[in-house]
Amino acid sequence: MTESTTDPARQNLDPTSPAPATSFPQDRGCPYHPPAGYAPLREGRPLSRVTLFDGRPVWAVTGHALARRLLADPRLSTDRSHPDFPVPAERFAGAQRRRVALLGVDDPEHNTQRRMLIPTFSVKRIGALRPRIQETVDRLLDAMERQGPPAELVSAFALPVPSMVICALLGVPYADHAFFEERSQRLLRGPGADDVNRARDELEEYLGALIDRKRAEPGDGLLDELIHRDHPDGPVDREQLVAFAVILLIAGHETTANMISLGTFTLLSHPEQLAALRAGGTSTAVVVEELLRFLSIAEGLQRLATEDMEVDGATIRKGEGVVFSTSLINRDADVFPRAETLDWDRPARHHLAFGFGVHQCLGQNLARAELDIAMRTLFERLPGLRLAVPAHEIRHKPGDTIQGLLDLPVAW
């Protein structure tokens, strides 16, 4: 019997077929569930084709096992300077070609960069940092309690916790937090490429000037160590230092702040699971892992094939883009039964919220420590914490690549 050429699953794997109808990435209707428009991807194979904003078809990975395999495959490049590298949104069209430390380079350069930073983000170093994180969390909750309810949790707690911690770790003055937080927001969610590029320029100028001052007057942050410490591969030049500072500062506060606020909203919207946490039968560390899986706030890792690859019955050609839907990968029912359910009893630590392979998130130990301490202390100190407005009035950040809340009014 002849196989039908109109079979949609087969056609979706054929690069010569018409551009696929599913666009990627998409805004979420609900901040903690994948977009409804991803339904065709969820019902099909772990590898299919989608269309980017500019109409370009690329490969989309939605299965957990396949994602682990491909994220560890050196034939898929993260080099954003390549003209064919997939751009997830129009606002990134110009910025995508600029130098990006760690996330945007391949080995051996990536390995060289990562070796410089690994000691700072090791389990041991982050463990030693936990008392400082706890002190920061307690100080912010003290201020909230003095002011009394209601409070806006994003500005009062979720954003300051990681901002204060990453500033102390890097040696960036927290007094400048309004400047770099605003530029970070524009860089990630600006209305167009010009605004994204201006935000990046302003942030690089600020951090470059800070690095110049640190050369003359050393402090005790990571940037100071990178400037003045001897490195096996030689001194770190100014351009590289600025690139490090940009990625570490943004990644070090933006994603964790979104996880704290969105994680809190998710718990307050799931009373049964929150009751189990408050009863003390579940550790906060377990809750954090399940929230990381369930929320998958960073969507759409990108790669570029550097040679032809046979993958899951399809051929990914050299020069074709590959994107990874973290929100669907972490809802793979073959790995996470009842994946749509928030479940403290499931082993969730093998989620891919931090990526996988050599480019797995360098700061995941820090993020886990901040989330563990912030979430545990928040619900211990404010046992009556609740939403101050109906859930449908909570505004989430517009965006298709990183999820978060604009504000979170709470009372207790």
Curated annotation (Swiss-Prot):
InterPro entries: Cyt_P450, Cyt_P450_B, Cyt_P450_CS, Cyt_P450_sf. Keywords: Cytoplasm, Heme, Iron, Metal-binding, Monooxygenase, Oxidoreductase. It comes from the Bacteria. GO terms for cellular component: cytoplasm. Its EC number is 1.14.-.-. Its cofactor is heme. One of its GO terms (molecular function) is monooxygenase activity. Residues 1-38 are annotated as: Disordered. It is found in: Cytoplasm. Residues 1-25 have a biased composition (Polar residues). Signal peptide: none annotated. Heme binds at C361. Gene3D superfamilies: Cytochrome P450 (1.10.630.10). Transmembrane segments: none annotated. Belongs to the cytochrome P450 family. This is Cytochrome P450-SOY. The gene is cyp105D1.
